[in-house]
Amino acid sequence: MAPDITIYRSSFESVERQPNKPLFELPDGRTVSYRDTADTVHRIAARLLEDGVAPGDRVAMQVPKSPEAIALYLATLQVGGVFLPLNTAYTGAEMRYFLDDAQPRVLVCAPDRRDDYDAEQRGLVVETLGESGDGTLLHSQDRSDAVVDVGFDDPAAILYTSGTTGRSKGAVLTHGNLAANCAALLQAWQYTSEDRLIHALPIFHIHGLFVAANMTLVAGASMHYLSKFDTDVIIDLLPHATVLMGVPTFYTRLLRSERLASDSCSAMRLFVSGSAPLLASDHEAFAARTGHAILERYGMTETGMNTTNPYDGGIRKPGTVGKPLPGIEIRIVDRETGEPMADGEVGIVEVRGPNVFAGYWQMPEKTASEFRSDGFFITGDLGQIDDDGYLCIVGRDKDLVISGGYNIYPKEIEELLDSHPKVLESAVIGVPHPEFGETVVAVVVPNSGEQLRERELQDFVARDLARFKQPRAVRVVEALPRNVMGKVQKAELRTRYADLFVGADA
């Protein structure tokens, strides 16, 4: 869907339509209206201009989640800046890398971290913003409502990828990317000003900011705005909300609560899950408990959202991420030749549409290598299209295990392991092997109170897997390493078990 108005201007149309409507509903009972938010945006815009921010300058943010942080995002767009949200967990060398690479004009950080960044040496203006709106950013009462006229091809934000395979890359998202993706999601999920979203996601990530917040701002909806996920708080809010956007760990935690029931979900119309795969068993258990089928979608930092299971007019299939959003094309190609593959065959997922980013910040060669000549972006995800046209993500291409010349897809083994009654979850990786190049290792978390033995699990999967796919080793752990969005960090596991077969007999 081609955009016709930017996120900033759409958001301020919402302000004009309903200035007194609550945009943020906070845990302490306070509300912040659209008018109040607009006033904060204009105060921050004046401060950014005073700090010397010109169109195209980067404004970095590493602050606790607050309504003022969303206002900072909008103020950056207002003055023509490029918004750079950074994970609040980053420290030391990580932050130095992002600041040196993006070279922001302004960094807004938590008050207690003001002196952490060698600001003078970098020519960096440092402002502070705390969780309660305190800090230097809002010291002045000056306001600016002047809006820089930007084009849809102009950069709006830079989001850094997780960098699990080397140097973290800054994905440049344009005003057109953000607006087009938001418009497609509003249509697909029928999100309107009547919705009340439970927002418990971080706002330095595409899901929490460019999906949840953008949709709410543009639709003129309201959100219960939480600093973090808390099972009891979420369940208390369900009768007063219509939509929850989350990650799989949200739903596994909700399922552990005896308080989760269909009665508490009577006002809800939509539960969305993404950023990591949702177990089919959790999908089914949630539907049985609440009467709601979770809607899974597929997106990534470079593209925003690409596909979605249907809101209506079709079934939501566990283990799939649905069909392309309006205006977006998806295809599956051979990982070696790049030739299109038939439905049902596993290959690389490629995407084309107005949602696809402009490129990687200051990495023209890397950008060129990630696009086909016809404009399709090579996602690096492995997937297949089923008989109904639904996309199923099999895993990351970098997670593919090649053992003795055979391609092994970890998800197939993980699904089998997860079906064992004593297993809570699993992650399958490839590690170096002297004879086969790589071999399969399974890392497994047992259900509470259960004891698991390696041989027990190896025997269990042997009934349904060819010998070359069977884990040569199983390691039982208390928990899998995850990032803040709940994705299992397989690179960390590969490092941890890299020497498992060093010196083994070939």
Spell out what each predicted region is:
Residues 19-20, 142-160, 166-167, 190-196:
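Conserved pre-ATP/AMP-binding loop-to-beta segment of ANL
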Residues 20-66, 70-74, 91-96:
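Conserved AMP-binding/adenylate-forming core of the ANL superfamily
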Residues 37-46, 152, 171-192, 200-204, ...:
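Conserved structural elements of the adenylate-forming
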Residues 90, 107, 353, 358-359, ...:
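AMP-binding/adenylate-forming catalytic core of the ANL superfamily
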Residues 112-152, 167, 258:
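ANL superfamily adenylate-forming
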Residues 179-196, 204-243, 257-259:
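Conserved AMP-binding/adenylation subdomain of ANL enzymes
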Residues 241-246, 255-316, 329:
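Gly/Ser/Thr-rich phosphate-binding loop
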Residues 331, 343-357, 376, 382-383:
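AMP-binding/adenylate-forming core of the ANL superfamily
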